[in-house]
A protein has these predicted regions:
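Glycine-rich, acidic/polar active-site loops that bind/position phosphate-bearing ligands
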Residues: 1-162, 167-175, 180-375
C-alpha cells in the first residue's frame, strides 16, 4: 500500500481494504442479529475474467496508431468479422495454444490460479479467467496477469492489446467482475440453498445488494467510466451504460410475492426436455445469464460486466463494497432494534425490494423499450 506522510491514500489498495473492512463489519452485525454468531470474518470474493486481443508483432509495428494509442484510429473493416459467431469458443490454434500454455506456467509460478482460457466473440480475441479469491489478493493478481500477459505474448512474436475498443466493427474487450460474500468457513452468503423461499438470510443480502445498486447507481457507473470503456459500452456488444440487475424468473417471482402477498411463493421447477430418450430431463438454469445486463445474478454471485479490460478492478469493487456496506448498516440497525427479528427481517426484505425493484430488468438491455423505461 502507498500512502503519504499525512496518511492520505496514494493508491487504490488502501481504499479497497477500507471498503472490505466496512463491508465485513456490517455483514457481521447482520449475521449476529440473525443469530449466526459463529462467523468471525467475512471475505469479499471476486473473480475477474480478462479479455484481450492478440496481434502479430510484425503487423503491429507497421501501425503507428496501434503503437502510440493501443487501438486503431483509421482503416477499413475486416473482410470477415464476427457475423457467423464462429470464433467464440472455437478451436484454439497451435501458436496461441503454445502461448497460453506458457502464460499459465508463468502465472502459476506467481501463485495466480489461472484456470480457463478460450476464444472470444471477435477474431483474435481471447479470454483468461482465474479462480476467485479474496478481493485484495484477486485485484493484485489481475494487475500481475495483465503485465505477464503482455510480456509472454512478445516472446511468441505477438502483442496483447488491452484497450477496450482496439478495432471498429467487432466487439471490444472488458473484464467481468464476479462478486460474492463468504464467511471464513466457506459459507457463501449469496448461495440460495435448497429451500430458497425460506432462506431469509439469502433474501436479505440479495435485496440489500439490489437497494445498493439502485441508490448508488451513479457511483457504480462511474466505476467503469473511462475514455476507452465508454466507447465500448452500450453498442450492442457490451452491457448497456444504464445500470440494471438481472435476477431471472424464479427470484423475481419470489420477491414479487413477498411484496404483493406478504409471503414467499414457491417458484415453479422447470426442466429442459431435448426430446431424445438417451438424454435425461435436466433442471433449467433459472439464472440464465442475460448477456445484455450490466449486473446479473449467476447462481451464487453477482457478475458485474461493465469493467474495462485495461482497468484495475479495485475501483469498481471499492464502490460495490461501500454501497452494500451502507445498506447493510441500515439493515443491522433495524434488526438490532427489533423485538421480533424474523418479522423485521421479512419487513426489511419487502421494503428493500419494493422501494428499489425498478432497477430489476430481465429483458433485452439493448431494446428501445428499456431505454424509455429507464428514463
Amino acid at each position: 500500500a502507498f500512502f503519504s506522510y499525512n496518511g492520505q491514500a496514494l493508491d487504490k489498495k488502501v481504499p479497497l481494504l477500507r471498503s472490505t473492512l466496512a463491508l465485513e463489519k456490517q455483514t457481521l452485525r447482520v449475521l449476529k442479529a440473525l443469530g449466526k454468531t459463529k462467523a468471525r470474518r467475512i471475505i469479499v470474493n471476486i473473480g475477474p475474467e480478462q479479455e484481450y486481443f492478440l496481434v502479430d508483432k510484425k503487423f503491429y509495428d507497421q501501425r503507428a496508431d496501434l503503437r502510440l494509442t493501443g487501438r486503431t484510429v483509421m482503416g477499413n473493416l475486416a473482410a470477415k468479422g464476427q457475423e457467423l459467431n464462429d470464433h467464440y469458443y472455437g478451436t484454439i490454434g497451435d501458436r496461441v495454444s503454445v502461448f497460453m500454455s506458457e502464460l499459465n506456467y508463468e502465472l502459476w509460478k506467481l501463485g495466480i490460479s489461472s484456470k480457463t482460457q478460450h476464444k472470444e466473440a471477435a477474431p483474435n480475441q481471447f479470454e483468461i479467467a482465474v479462480v476467485y479469491d479474496a478481493a485484495n489478493l484477486s485485484t493484485d493478481h489481475n494487475q500481475l496477469l495483465m503485465d505477464v500477459l503482455q510480456m509472454v505474448a512478445l516472446r511468441h512474436g505477438m502483442v496483447a492489446l488491452l484497450h477496450e475498443k482496439p478495432f471498429a466493427g467487432v466487439n471490444g474487450s472488458g473484464k467481468h467482475d464476479n462478486w460474492s460474500l463468504a464467511t471464513e468457513d466457506g459459507t457463501n452468503l449469496y448461495a440460495p440453498g435448497n429451500n430458497l423461499e425460506e432462506n431469509l438470510q439469502f433474501l436479505l443480502f440479495l435485496t440489500a445488494f439490489i437497494k445498493a445498486m439502485d441508490v448508488y447507481a451513479p457511483l457504480i457507473r462511474a466505476g467503469a467510466a473511462t475514455a476507452g470503456n465508454d466507447h465500448r459500452l452500450g453498442s450492442s456488444e457490451a452491457p448497456p451504460a444504464i445500470i440494471s440487475i438481472y435476477l431471472g424468473e424464479q427470484l423475481s417471482s419470489i420477491l414479487d410475492a413477498i411484496t404483493e402477498e406478504g409471503n414467499c411463493a414457491k417458484g415453479k421447477s422447470q426442466y429442459v426436455k431435448m426430446g431424445i430418450t438417451a438424454l435425461p430431463e435436466l433442471p433449467k438454469d433459472l439464472t440464465d445469464r442475460n448477456r445484455t445486463s450490466p449486473i446479473a445474478f449467476t447462481g451464487n454471485k453477482f457478475e458485474y460486466r461493465m469493467v474495462g479490460s485495461s482497468q484495475s478492478v479495485a475501483g469498481p469493487n471499492i464502490y460495490i463494497n461501500g454501497a452494500v456496506a451502507q445498506v447493510l448498516q441500515e439493515a443491522a440497525d433495524r434488526l438490532e432494534a427489533a423485538d421480533d427479528v424474523e418479522l423485521e427481517c421479512h419487513n426489511i426484505i419487502r421494503d428493500f425490494y419494493q422501494g428499489h425493484k425498478r432497477i430489476i430488468f430481465n429483458g433485452n438491455g439493448y431494446s428501445q423499450e428499456w431505454k424509455a423505461e429507464a428514463k
